[in-house]
Structure formats: structure tokens, C-alpha cells
């Protein structure tokens, strides 16, 4: 194998979780009615589905936390917090 070709390693479970977390956070924003649906292009809030997506994001964040540096941990915590705050606001809470 030539030395100038970089070796590519297989993704870890944490790499896969990060991708899923990113997808679920997008779904959560869509289901909160804060982003258009990726398929229809319409704003279609569904707070029941938003809650599930937010719970999944929170769980995935807890699994990834040990693999992250402090800056990435803060970003992840902010994401989960922002999703939860927006969920409460959409429900009519304060």
C-alpha cells in the first residue's frame, strides 16, 4: 500500500451516535414548528413527536459526553437546553 494514501479507520459507535444526534435535533426543531419539514417544506408542529425527539437527543448527548472536550460538551448541553426551553414555550409554559 503506498505511503501517501491515508488510512481510513472505521467509524466508532460514538461517530454513529453523533450523526444520529444531529438528525434527531433537526427533527426536534421541525416538530417544534421552528423549522420547515425537510420533506414537505411546511411548518408542521407536532409536540408529541417533538418531545420524543428531544428525549432521544438528551439520551444520545449523555452517551456522547464522555467522548467530548469541554467546548463540545457546552455546545451539546446548550442544544439540549434550547430544545427543552422551546418545547416548554410551545406548550404555553413560561
Give the role of each language-model region.
Residues 1-59, 71-94:
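N-terminal intrinsically disordered, cationic/polar leader segments
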Residues 61-68:
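Well-ordered alpha/beta subsegment
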Amino acid at each position: 500500500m503506498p505511503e501517501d494514501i491515508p488510512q481510513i479507520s472505521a467509524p466508532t459507535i460514538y461517530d454513529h451516535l453523533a450523526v444520529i444526534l444531529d438528525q434527531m435535533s433537526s427533527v426536534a426543531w421541525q416538530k417544534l414548528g421552528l423549522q420547515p419539514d425537510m420533506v414537505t417544506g411546511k411548518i408542521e408542529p407536532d409536540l408529541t413527536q417533538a418531545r420524543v425527539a428531544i428525549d432521544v437527543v438528551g439520551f444520545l448527548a449523555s452517551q456522547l459526553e464522555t467522548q467530548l472536550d469541554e467546548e463540545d460538551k457546552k455546545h451539546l448541553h446548550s442544544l439540549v437546553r434550547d430544545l427543552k426551553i422551546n418545547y416548554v414555550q410551545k406548550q404555553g409554559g413560561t
